[in-house]
Regions:
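C-terminal helical "tail/cap" subdomain of flavin- and related membrane-associated enzymes
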Residues: 354-474
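Glycine-rich FAD pyrophosphate-binding loop
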Residues: 49-78
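N-terminal FAD cofactor-binding segment of flavoenzymes
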Residues: 68-120
Length: 474
């Protein structure tokens, strides 16, 4: 939360810093171009203008975005599964960004983990509904008009309400003449700015053009994913999937994460891994665990699909003089909580620009440390997913994980150690470092070892197979 006294104090510290490059600081009338009005671009604009208000700084912010998030299908979609973690919902609320009911599709009450050895439902920690399923656009292609609003559109409007100017244009190039940045658009127009913020994500051609603008720039490393939408209707979704996000731990090479997410009349499927292709998808759709989630065991045709690329390695460096990259364009969390990373990078970049400056050295000192922290955590995340891949390939390990989780959910007296690890992995609610350290706890290791043995006793059925696990039982 921002206070005027805090802003004035930080501005005073900037003024006292020696030496000060006044040519690369923001002043009254400075022009800022934000390229991309997804979550990172909209939140940057919102935070920048809000922070500027605390120090009586008048800025002219132009938010470039050719798409309209009120449109259904590809024209308004931002290619994302649309899950917002509980911790992020709380952080956004403290910033004055309270997600209204017409933006949230439904609260996720639980996660249901599907494996070939059985299923188990994992209740929300403390039984609080703080996981939100959202549409990044305004619904799938050919869908009926929705009585909801786009999450991206909601954030975009917050930026406009704070004072940003809408620029419905496609940016094709960004250049630096030493004194200012120039933004060039597909319609032939161009404009000069004191700062350009790249928030396009990694599915934009603009990222490639930046390689020629920054001599040492390495763009984000990416991988291909798959997202599609199924139309089932609210009543059928209630009967088959319920208010639960269905996650699959299957022995399919290169598949790191798969989930079905209920949203109103639709169900979103997300497949994440190492370059998702037709062979992998065929294996996934043919598995009994997936088919059994649909009515009659038949997977209906999808009404909308895409193969978006996601950032799996931070761009280096993600800044330059009068230039900074945020969200997926710069750094994001591995596989999960991309919207949370957009929030953190947007706020850090805005704070740097207002209270320190827009030179490359300013971003190196005050913005880049956050990027490095996220990147370091992602390295631990890669280790966590590598361990998960071993579990996927080992049937005896899946039995142990199933038994340990099922017992925790049925007996409130048992500490939910495995349940909390899985919950935070699925939701992205905690850093990978924290999740990994929990798996090193002696009690966690002892319980897992015991359940690996007990879950593989010949002739004994897994606990979750014997009776359904209800979310209200612990």
């Amino acid at each position: 939360v921002l206070h005027a006294s805090d802003g004035l104090s930080q501005l005073g510290q900037r003024a006292q810093a020696q030496p000060v490059d006044l040519a690369k600081t923001l002043h009254d009338g400075s022009r800022i171009a934000v390229v991309g009005a997804g979550p990172s671009g909209s939140m940057f604009s919102y935070f920048l203008l809000k922070m500027a208000d605390t120090v009586a700084l008048e800025l002219d912010v132009h938010l470039y975005e050719p798409r309209h998030f009120c449109h259904r299908g590809p024209a308004g979609c931002n290619h994302c599964g649309g899950i917002v973690s509980e911790s992020l919902v709380q952080r956004l609320a403290t910033e004055g960004i309270a997600l209204p009911d017409d933006v949230v599709q439904r609260g996720i009450e639980s996660y249901t983990l599907h494996m070939d050895v059985g299923d188990v439902e994992i209740a929300t920690p403390l039984h609080e509904r703080r996981i939100a399923a959202i549409y990044r656009g305004n619904g799938p292609r050919n869908s009926e008009p929705l009585d909801t609003h786009s999450f991206d559109g909601y954030l975009q409007q917050l930026a406009y309400d704070q004072g940003a100017t809408a620029m419905p244009k496609l940016v094709t190039n960004v250049t630096n003449d030493g004194e200012q940045m120039r933004v060039e658009c597909a319609d032939g127009s161009s404009a000069d700015y004191d700062l350009v913020v790249i928030a396009t994500g990694v599915n934009s051609r603009l990222i490639k053009t930046l390689q020629g603008q920054l001599s040492e720039y390495s763009p984000p490393e990416v991988t291909k994913t798959f997202i599609c939408e199924f139309h089932l209707g609210k009543e059928l979704i209630r009967k088959t999937l319920g208010p639960s996000m269905h996650v699959f731990l299957l022995d399919i090479p290169r598949l790191e994460f798969a989930a079905l997410i209920p949203k109103g009349n639709y169900v979103t499927l997300c497949l994440l891994g190492d370059d998702i292709d037709d062979k992998l998808m065929e294996q996934f759709f043919s598995s009994p665990e997936v088919k059994n989630c649909f009515p009659g065991g038949v997977i209906p045709p999808h009404v909308c699909h895409c193969y978006p690329r996601i950032n799996i390695q931070t761009a280096k460096p993600s800044y330059g003089d009068r230039l900074v990259m945020i969200g997926d364009s710069g750094t994001t969390r591995l596989f999960k909580d991309g919207i949370g990373a957009s929030y953190r990078t947007a706020k850090a970049a805005a704070r740097t620009a207002v209270f320190h400056g827009v030179a490359a050295e300013d971003f190196r000192k005050y913005y880049w440390p956050l990027c490095k922290k996220v990147d370091s955590d992602n390295q631990i995340g890669k280790l966590v997913f590598a361990i998960g891949s071993l579990v996927q390939r080992a049937r005896f390990a899946r039995r142990g994980v199933l038994r340990m989780t099922a017992n925790e959910q049925k007996n409130p007296e048992i500490p939910p150690r495995m349940s909390e690890v899985l919950w935070d992995l699925f939701s992205g609610s905690a850093p990978y470092r924290e999740v990994f350290l929990r798996t090193l706890h002696p009690a966690y290791i002892a319980s897992l070892m015991w359940n690996l043995v007990a879950g593989n006793v010949p002739g004994k059925k897994p606990a979750a197979k014997q009776e359904p696990v209800e979310s209200g039982n612990g």
